[in-house]
């Protein structure tokens, strides 16, 4: 049974244009309050981004739903997430596909996310501590890649790791950022601009 707060959020997301009911079902199934600090639990089902420490945030539910919807996932999709963060977006993906690969540059966040996912019995996720700019070459190619922080330009390594017909969704820019969708068609990459957004920057390298 979906709580009143969750139902209200889902209706808000529908009003904002989210149409994929499977994505909405995944949002309803994942307890967002488990991925944030106790001090913010009362705001868990509000449509806002929240801090998770280390200068990072958990994205607002609308943006999670929008980016996930743009990936056009099927259960068989091979998915790479860049920026595990709290693990919330990872959990949404894990409800929609058979397996998710996720890369996080901050070791502490990776550990916390793995613990949360395990507590929720989400075992179809592989996480890695590493530089998100480089993707996860050993697991490539991917049908879908989602990036939860903004590089100033689209990383070429991520485009190279897309399979034929694959989709990359990411925010791009410095002061001014736009959500982009990149689709691979043979040797070409078709890039569409979706909407203006605001994300933390995608930093190169990794932190212990």
Curated annotation (Swiss-Prot):
Gene of this entry: pcm
Localization: Cytoplasm
GO biological process: one example: methylation
UniProt keyword Cytoplasm present: yes
Catalysed conversion reaction: [protein]-L-isoaspartate + S-adenosyl-L-methionine = [protein]-L-isoaspartate alpha-methyl ester + S-adenosyl-L-homocysteine
Entry's EC annotation: 2.1.1.77
Residues at the active site: 59
Annotated GO MF terms: protein-L-isoaspartate (D-aspartate) O-methyltransferase activity
Similarity section: Belongs to the methyltransferase superfamily. L-isoaspartyl/D-aspartyl protein methyltransferase family.
Record-level GO cellular component terms: cytoplasm
Keyword entries, A-Z: Cytoplasm, Methyltransferase, S-adenosyl-L-methionine, Transferase
Top enzyme category: transferase
Lineage: Bacteria, Pseudomonadati, Pseudomonadota, Gammaproteobacteria, Enterobacterales
Function (record text): Catalyzes the methyl esterification of L-isoaspartyl residues in peptides and proteins that result from spontaneous decomposition of normal L-aspartyl and L-asparaginyl residues. It plays a role in the repair and/or degradation of damaged proteins.
Annotated protein name in UniProt: Protein-L-isoaspartate O-methyltransferase
